[in-house]
Amino acid sequence: MDPAMCSELLSFLKPETRADVRAQALEYILGVSGTPEGRQSLCAEPRLLQVVLDLTTEQSAHIAQDAHHVLVNLTSDPTTHKSLLGHVPTLLPSLLTLLQDPTCPFSDSTCTALCNLSREEESCQSFLQTLKQEGLCQLLHMLCTPKYNGHASLDYLGPLVCNLTQLPEGRDFILDRDRCVIQRLLPYVTAGSTVRKGGIVGTLRNCCFNHRDHEWLLSDQVDLLPFLLLPLAGGEEYTDEEMESLPPDLQYLPEDKERESDPDIRKMLIETVQLLCATAGGRRIVRQKGTYLIMRELHSWERESYVSRACEKLIQVLIGDEPEAGLENLMEVTVPPDLEETFTRVDQEDEGSLDQ
């Protein structure tokens, strides 16, 4: 941005300037933040960024709202994150304070900006360092408290927590056996908006990469599997013998039982179950719980090819032979790079042919 233009905007945004002039200047910045070039130019101006952040608490609702929208636009571009966090060290603490305020009318925008900032691993690491244990506990409390903020849905808390679990520290918090964190999330697999549910299911999927926790996750202490299978189950009839093999929560479902309507969430649920099959103990429990029956009926019902493909992969594991000795833990098997490339290419070709 031209230095003269930046100085002029800063003069228009001073607290003593008339509110209508400040509003017009901020509207201009909001427009600039809507393009990739504009975002890069704004992120090169630390003083301007700080002023925009300060305006998120402006008494004028219109100005505060536009300031939030500018930050949402800026954070939507991953290439800006390093500049934003470097030029404005108070950005993360300030946004977290706004998010945790149950009276803030713009918390949905704040949550979206933080969700954007936590997508990339490097900025996510900065976020976790800012949050610390107390902040993580507060985020979970907000996520599990209906109407925590009467002015905002806070649906993007789901994807935000999911982003944090891309890192081992985030997963370790959710999987803390003393805090019973993951158990508090399970009811929300089938409750709330698609955005919130998708974030919760994504969190569970990320946590299942910690293969040493699989048997605990499948034990009665957590009982994760029924929560994953219920959204995938319909109202199909089973034989008495088949019904007995299913977890109690999946037995005798009503004929009008509907499956999860979002195909991306269905795919994530299937992938989460497949991750639990990566260990010998996990495969044994998943098979014993009648998972194949749910997948069989889902595959017959499913109309989205990419979800059907995920279903087929899981079924292959469920009905396949056990790996040879020494290869029981699929997450610890080293795949040569050339074979990995071949498998990836075959998967892409299969998905392409299914979409045609």
Swiss-Prot record:
InterPro entries linked to this entry: ARM-like, ARM-type_fold, Hgh1, Protein_HGH1_C, Protein_HGH1_N
Family: Belongs to the HGH1 family.
Record lineage: Eukaryota, Metazoa, Chordata, Craniata, Vertebrata
Database matches in Gene3D superfamilies: Leucine-rich Repeat Variant
PANTHER family documented for this protein: PROTEIN HGH1 HOMOLOG
Protein name: Protein HGH1 homolog
Pfam families cross-referenced by the UniProt entry: DUF383, DUF384
